[in-house]
Amino acid sequence: MRTIRRTTAAIVVAAGALIAATTVAGAITGGADDDPVDPTHPNVGIVVFYQPDGRFRCSGTLVHPRVVVTAAHCTFGDVGKVAVSFDTEVAPDAAAGRRVIPRALDDLGFGEEGSGFDDGLWIVELDADGNPLPHYPYDNTGFADGTADGSPVWVTGTALTHPDYSDFTDIKNWNDTGVVILDEAITGVATAALPPEGYLDGIPQKALVKELIRTVGYGTEVRQADTGPQAPTPMSFPIRRQLTDEKPQKLTSQILQMNGNERDPFGGGGTCFGDSGGPAFHGGYIVGDTSYGYTSNCRYLGGYQRVDIPVVRSWLVCVLNNAGSGAAAATAACGSLD
């Protein structure tokens, strides 16, 4: 988790570290599990990315067979490939997470250190004979053969960051949107639609605050632990797709702000760590991606990067138009912040 201090508030980035926690908890605060048999949002996936200080998770939305929209703070500074899965449940607990979530995508997942892999985050488990248990293997293309034991299937991709992303330094030019260009197309999953330009501006403010916006992600839930200190804290597991409906509070030129308190009588909760980059849906469109919250225990106001504004939408359209030719072609045509 990265925290950016402001003069008036602490803006907490909603990316989630893949830490080893033993307490079972859900994802989106106050939300509900997506149905694993007949999912409501099968085009929302978990995005696992790698940086010099560790391995983290975000969420994202398939908007093209080879393009996942996520947050720029999830893609900026990534090392090597990104891993994406659209499985409804990824890991029920920390032990499973250590086995089924890829380590670094430039190794085979058996313990060799690679780019973005922080050795301090990993626990080596031993079998009855004292031999190290391997992490879940996958081949060099990045696809895991998850069909045999129900483990998640992963696909690799390359992260691109909006070229005008301000890294939380300019609220008027926030542009917290990134994408993952997948190495192979996803089939059998309906893609989400981008909104018309200025879609949210077309809803009067008085009407907008009466609407419900669906948010989806693979993040943590803030709750009391089953044992030990009872102060509400973010819980990392299980990692699974959850959803909720939030009430908008205000709209700016860049941000849709919503109330993420699950006790709001008009809404159902909000997003938390690991939900970053996940979608905000309205009217059949993805209108935003999860950007930040104001507190370290979530359950308060959240900011969602608008994707209907020209500066973001035009970049996404360019990426979609070039994604079929691969990440290098999309980068050359549309740009990406290094």
Predicted regions and their residues:
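Short amphipathic beta-strand segments in non-cytosolic proteins
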Residues: I46-V48
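Secretory targeting and sorting signals
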Residues: M1-A27
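C-terminal subregion of chymotrypsin/trypsin-like serine protease catalytic domains
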Residues: T40-H41, R57, L62-F76, V82-P92, ...
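Chymotrypsin/trypsin-fold serine protease catalytic domain
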Residues: N173-G268, G302, I309-L316
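Short, solvent-exposed aromatic-acidic interface loops
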Residues: T75, P163-Y165, G260-P265, S291-T295
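Conserved catalytic-core segment of clan PA serine endopeptidases
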Residues: T29-T40, Y50-P52, V82-G188, G198-L200
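C-terminal region of N-terminal signal peptides and the immediate post-cleavage residues
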Residues: I19-P36, K81, A327-D338
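Short loop/turn motifs at secondary-structure junctions and domain boundaries
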Residues: Y50-D53, R263-D264, G269-C272
